[in-house]
């Protein structure tokens, strides 16, 4: 168990110091307590760790160093929160400080949502202020893993999330290398990451989360520790990143370790989250900013499509190659439907959709059968799913009421083992698999 008393017991054995970067979020919260016991912390200092965890301190750091974040503001009571929300506009992501796995983070869409959040999900006060920032709805999110010795920085991996921003990084599938982003964007990401790490005086491992939209890279979070994707990146690269970082924290420089960088990846590696929803009845399997996954799997392939399909199969999801696809998407996603509908039509899928989405599909010139929503009578989409007449579900939604109204669709898909995605980027990835018609390649683990 990670606790200050347990760490103190370990220190009685007279080590040179303690490394707290390998226990996730929990040991980071012990940094100040350990420092007060005069226990040396190897690697990034407790003060810099606190800088990354304290939303208000980090916001000031961002402003001081001319870094770019989404429009945001701090609030320690309901009145302040509503004022900030009115200033930057909805939808917003509400982020408390010092939380594990995105706990109590939420996307809110109006004043009513915000007030309910502040009075139920998280008790905001002077000791527990929250950061409210503009939700970058259609942004592409990235995780960047790096090692720094306080002087030299090596970026070890840039992972592109498949689900768009707003889904917790632990729940989103991700690809290394990035699968559809330009070298120009990669360069912008590297510049931003190097700037953050050098100014924060990071020593050891660090995870930086960013988003890209409208030709702008935004800094979301910095985690001065080994993230949950370090084992995945190490496996993809064939490089023991944890071992190298431990030596750096123990005092070695990257130059002394002759660690100049990581090799180019000649294949695609996709990490997919494993969800526990089938163990919990009546839980809506929709993804959001609060982490819900309990594990992860890895797919490796010569193309992104191959790696993604392997990862889905490993996570227990079979992507149907033909059949009937049900589509119901929020208004902001309808602009992206053309590519998806074209792909499904070319693969011979029959299309069914609720009224609003069906109208958009018809306007594109495709055949589609309109189906009733659950509250509009029967037969409705739930009936078709239970009758095994649906093979693929694409369901995106926003707003508390809309999410609640469509929860039964996602739950039925899970119970009936129907392939279901709740993001438009997830739907695009599925269509990539369908259009490529990939024959799987196989390699010995020793050759990877």
Question: Language model features by range: what are they?
Answer:
Residues 23, 44-49, 77, 97, ...:
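Short, ordered loop/turn segments at secondary-structure junctions
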Residues 37-44, 57-69, 96-102, 166-180, ...:
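Gly-rich Lys/Arg/Thr-decorated short loops/hinges at beta-loop-alpha junctions or inter-strand turns
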Residues 1-11:
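Single conserved hydrophobic/aromatic residue that forms the stacking wall/gate
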Residues 8, 40, 205, 226-231, ...:
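Acidic, glycine-enriched active-site microenvironments
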Residues 12-13, 88, 388:
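Active-site charged/polar residues at nucleotide-handling catalytic sites that mediate phosphoryl
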Residues 13-53, 68-74, 344, 415-424:
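A short, GP-enriched loop/loop-strand-helix hinge that lies immediately N-terminal to
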Residues 88-293:
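Internal nucleotide-binding/catalytic subdomain
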Residues 44-105, 364-371, 425-432, 437-438:
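A conserved helix-loop-beta module that forms one wall/lid of the active-site cleft
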